[in-house]
Amino acid sequence: MKQVLRVLILLLVRIAGLPGARAAERQARAPLPGAPRILLVRPDHLGDLVLTTPVLYALKAQMPDAHVTMMVGPWSSEVVARHPAIDRLLTCPFPGFRRGKQGLIAPYILLVSIAQQLQRGQYDLAINLRPDFWWGAALLYLARIPRRVGYAIEPGTPFLTHALPFSAPEHATLSALR
């Protein structure tokens, strides 16, 4: 039942988000602005978030004028709360990473709610840093972010504009730096 519900909701997300995503993707054909607004999404717990921090330095080295927002779970926000490469920190109680029971529909209600909030951020680029996080890819799609980067792992791939190949045996830090 849960699997069928997810497939149906993923289909609805694609259909509902299509007009906004198409309009956002047309914007993506233009070069990034000089000071792009970038959103990084990493829902994981402490260890995986620590392994992602080299990405922050690499991103700021490549785009020093970028405004970088990072969205993490409240359980790991202290890891990057004072990181010099982050201009803004957002927290989200990502489904699948929270402990305790949650309703069958609750993750999808949260998806729409957070996507609406992210639309106000007017991001030029978003990077989903967790390889198998379809919810994050769908979030970026519904938020109408023009350039959505993540790993080519189903069922999240259709929500991305740039799907990167994923190599499972690769160390998490190296994978994130790609």
Predicted segments, located by residue:
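Catalytic machinery of carbohydrate-active enzymes
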Residues: 1-178
